[in-house]
């Protein structure tokens, strides 16, 4: 029974590597770029376990903000760096000459093709010439590979219809995902023997209080505000998004997917979709969210959708009250919640990705999406980021 399958059914020990003042011997050295985000933090946690394939792992974590306290327990060697700055990136990352694996899970927070491309290029240019033992480059993109920038769609440029398959052609529009993937292909040419993998996740369910792409924390904050104001949890999106099928990926499963592609020879030099292996509807998940916060759930009722970002625009002080009342870790509303992301999701249509290629190449990891959703909420509570 593989480690990945045992993780999926909860039969791994998940014991962390113990340092105890002794310099351990590492088999692999990871550079996680975007370590404070939802994917990066999940990967850092998975690499901290003693039974993780390829380990024991030494971990460097790069992010722009100061190292958060919740990340410190994972034994990450933190590198605060603005990777949009070429000189700063080289000065801070090039000296890390023992790197064996790059895991790139960062973006600038916009669709800026040039800036996102520069950021990844700065990392590759800093590591590839200076890390003689570099073996593998992992890149996270996503399902925007298939449906692109909706604002640029017209009659001659339409998104692919789902289910999405990895061999679908690129859309006829600018998309920084395409540029990043091209940089991956180029990196394999630059260094002989360097392997790569590209990961295209669905919605990511997981833990991070400072991620620009955390649907769970955003909805938790919305629910907490509704409860604080004695209001029901109202679904703000369209009928289509309410009733259609969705897929998501647990951040732990995503981390396992990264490790599988980086350590199993058969999986290298490929692009893969990644999701939990099941589907869900928001009409069902909405009740789960409301139950977790003990409030009334009101679903789609035929009304015009409203922007959650507009509803929450004057709620900064309300969130401050909630943080104080429940003695939570201090956060600002705009840091812990990305209401624009919820608005994108709640105005979209089904985005289902095929997992057949994963099975053909041997990846059998999975998660129950409802359990993943609840687990993510509980983890946010355990770290005292939500009431």
UniProtKB/Swiss-Prot annotation:
Transmembrane segments: none
EC number(s) stated in the UniProt entry for this protein: 1.3.1.122, 1.3.1.123
Keyword ATP-binding attributed: no
SUPFAM superfamilies: NAD(P)-binding Rossmann-fold domains (SSF51735)
GO BP terms, alphabetized: terpenoid metabolic process
Active site, renumbered: 144, 177
Domain of life of the native organism: Eukaryota
Protein name: (S)-8-oxocitronellyl enol synthase
Organism (species): Antirrhinum majus
